[in-house]
Amino acid sequence: MAGKHGRNGFEDDDVNPFAGGSVPPANNSRLPPLSHEPADFYNVDIPLDSSKDLKKKEKELQAMEAELNKRERELKRKEEAAAQAGIVIEDKNWPPFFPLIHHNISNEIPIHLQRMQYLAFSSFLGLAACLFWNIIATTTAWVKGEGVIIWLLAIIYFISGVPGAYVLWYRPLYNAMRTESALKFGWFFLFYLIHIIFCVWAAVAPPFPFKGKSLAGILPAIDVIGRSAIVGIFYFVGFGLFCLESLLSIGVIQQVYMYFRGSGKAAEMKREAARGALSSAF
């Protein structure tokens, strides 16, 4: 079979595929190394102040400090001058939720006078509470047919009585306690007596000179309770509040007067009054 066909098809031929030279042998050479170059970093030049610049800035800081010290001394001088003239710069801090007035008993009133001042402050708040309840009582009476006039008068009592009490007797007492001014004590006594008279009058509430039921006192309470028990109860509560306010106010004026006499302020007030009369005469 082998002789007939001449060669065996399964016989390996000893053939070199690269013998013809058509495919070049692999080159074993390396790539050339990269040249060494210096890293190109950014250079940041931070200039250092010279001694001349430092001295200049130091002089500027010293000038600013001197100016601030000058302003501080000027402000202190104005505050001292205002204090000597009786002018007090006050920040509004009361009531806390809506400041309307300056009020700081613990820091501005001497310790031995703070109790009296707190009692007077309670009297002021008590008057506000009485007049506010008086509005409620007259409102119930108005609803039950007593007329709108008494309600309008109750509103007038409140919006005039509370600020009036603060200006006429509470603030003078506050300043008197703080500055030990005898004349301010005299002003307080005058208008606080009027306050006590009004509280006693309101507790009774006669039909004159005010409109009969515009004050929640004992007489209107007796009059209306027969027609309306609810209105009568509101008026009796108002009567009780005015009685408590009257008693508290009497206690306040007694304590303030005892301090006024014991501290020699009465004689001082007489001397100041006499001095004022002489100066006005001449």
Swiss-Prot record:
It comes from Oryza sativa subsp. japonica (Rice). The chain crosses the membrane at residues 118-138, 148-168, 185-205, 230-250. It is a multi-pass membrane protein. This is Secretory carrier-associated membrane protein 3. Keywords: Cell membrane, Coiled coil, Cytoplasmic vesicle, Membrane, Transmembrane, Transmembrane helix, Transport. Residues 1-36 are annotated as: Disordered. Probably involved in membrane trafficking. Residues 1-117, 251-282 are cytoplasmic. The keyword Transmembrane helix applies. Belongs to the SCAMP family. GO terms for cellular component: plasma membrane; recycling endosome membrane; trans-Golgi network membrane; transport vesicle membrane. Residues 48-92 form a coiled coil. Pfam families: SCAMP. The keyword NADP does not apply. It is found in: Cell membrane; Cytoplasmic vesicle, Secretory vesicle membrane. GO terms for biological process: protein transport.
